[in-house]
């Protein structure tokens, strides 16, 4: 078997290095915690009582402590946004925070299962041990109970079963097919983690093996979480004015807002709340305005329950174009909108590269709107100076031709002001055209494309990523290219695969980044 060369390792490291290190450290930490505890109890008097059952139960309990201490960290969005601005951003994959949060949750799930199964076995063995043997081996007085009483009549027993019920509620509501249509239910059940942590604190109060220590593991992360919530609460109290709501084709609402002291970077996102719809329901949306503009905007795709209600609230007459202006309060007197943020995202990293590939699928184009606007303003302010990015390849994939109208004005301006040809636009239409539209395209002779209104012609069908990446790999040999994507998972897999493949097989290094919030 051939070992990989130094160059192959370096190329693998481009997209996998920091993730691999984090997973290795996390795995080693879990193994060390389990093995240390297992060996400790193997050499303790308790092993004489119930054997390997106590070793396995306590090892799983140690995994629970470690992972419960970690699970809040990936959702501390303000902390992660701050850390993005430090040297740690070069080593820690902050964009994978939700993936890591889910990984920790699964480890907690399996550790809980192992802990419960081991103790069910231990309960069976406890009944065969007399109080005298407890006294002789462990030096304590302990009653002889039936397995049922151990499981349900002791503090550790009944709290453990309630913890399992809470976990079932939290885990099932987090399944995507349930979370998306019933987000508020997910929000409330996920906050049962407070009950979960509280029960685990008291779970070990009557332990005969060691003093309870769960609280020592979680007090730090819980303190950070409280600070996080206080920051978000204070920010959400700031007055937000809806200065304009505009209805675009293909069920997209553009909301432009003004609020106090809201500084952000291109590519970041915010959380939006409409108290009239749901007091505690916050949804993430990419910021589509640029920092140079005197408002903050989001483009919202009307696809779910909450966005549907927002559409009805802002556009009761089902009109197109501008439907609301300068609104502070909803008809019920509550604030029309509340903002929390901004928060860091993958697209923030775009200015680290001199050559970038931006891929937006449908409404996934939103983070790149902010970036392209920012570049436009920078070019206008610093004409003929060194640009922020040497070359931008912008791929916009839409199923519906009307979707191109969302940012047609911006794209048109960029095409006209395309200094040094820094921007290449590649619009793709994947949906079918009507017979009339086909005739217009075939026989039209306008200077602008009849589908998009851009000067760049529309391509039909899906992009051929292998050909595209092969071309870029030749064009940017020995260079680093940032690849940024926002859109569906299936397309993300294709782009990630292409980025990894052409990084390994050519001299170009494609750094893949995906929006994930």
From Swiss-Prot:
Which leading EC class covers this enzyme?
A: oxidoreductase
Q: How does it assemble?
A: Composed of a heavy chain and a light chain.
> What does the UniProt function comment say about this protein?
Critical component of the membrane-bound oxidase that generates superoxide. It is the terminal component of a respiratory chain that transfers single electrons from cytoplasmic NADPH across the plasma membrane to molecular oxygen on the exterior.
What is the protein's given name? Superoxide-generating NADPH oxidase heavy chain subunit A
Q: Which residues lie on this side of the membrane: Extracellular?
A: 41-62, 119-149, 206
Q: How does it sit in the membrane?
A: Multi-pass membrane protein
Q: Where are the transmembrane segments?
A: 20-40, 63-83, 98-118, 150-170, 185-205, 207-227
The places in or outside the cell where this protein is found are: Membrane
Q: Which residues lie on this side of the membrane: Cytoplasmic?
A: 1-19, 84-97, 171-184, 228-517
**Enzyme Commission numbers on file:** 1.-.-.-
Species the sequence originates in: Dictyostelium discoideum (Social amoeba)
Required co-factor(s) are: FAD
